[in-house]
Amino acid sequence: FDMEGAKKLLEEHGYRDSDGDGILDKDGEKVSLQIITYGRTGLPQSSQALQSALSQLGIEASVEQLDSTEDRGHAGTFDLSVYAEVTLPTGDPYSYLMNSYGTDGTNNFGRYSNAEVDAMLGELAVEFDTGRRAELAKQIDKTVLADNSYCNMFHLNMYMAMKDTVEGLEQSPVDYYHITAQTCVK
């Protein structure tokens, strides 16, 4: 993160601390953002770190920790949301990508909309070739990230402990279904 570069961009776009109180304003209106999150491991701390970084930029931010961000997410009553997702609960990218990045996606709380992404999602929905599906998923991800509408902050490490009699229990960085048909106890 380039703090000085961010400050310069804000200034170039007309954001200044016109009254010397440390908070940027534009056209007389102070920049104040609300961050919502919930109590899952690492999220409150990440929200506080984000709040601190915004403060260093001259942006006032408050953090509200909720039981769940889902209702507020659907209503769109927030400025920034810090939440966690299991990205591939089905082992296939379509569900996650469509729900998160599709214009009408059920988890598209930021109201992201990109016609090119929607077209690629439409193609992904009917494509059966696994290589082409993987390529489409990568292209969708690249396009969304290039639009700067999402910021992935961290990946939570998961740990597993088991007896030495358990075989075939695989850990995945993108899934929570660890027990498969290959999992057994000797």
Predicted feature residues:
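Bilobed periplasmic-binding protein-like "clamshell/Venus-flytrap" ligand-binding domains
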Residues: H13-T37, A84, F128-K163
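Short, solvent-exposed loop/turn elements at domain surfaces
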Residues: G42-Q45, G91, A161-M162
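Periplasmic binding protein-like
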Residues: S52-Y101
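Bilobed "Venus flytrap"/periplasmic-binding protein-like clamshell domains
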Residues: M3-K7, H13, T37-L50
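Short, solvent-exposed loop/beta-turn-alpha elements that line the ligand-binding surface or hinge
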Residues: F1-K8, S18-V31, H74-T77, Y96-V126, ...
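Generic hydrophobic alpha-helical scaffold/packing signal
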Residues: K7, Q51, S55, Y94, ...
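Conserved structured core elements
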Residues: T41-P44, Q48, R111, A115, ...
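Short, well-ordered beta-strand elements
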Residues: K30-G39, A61-E64, D79
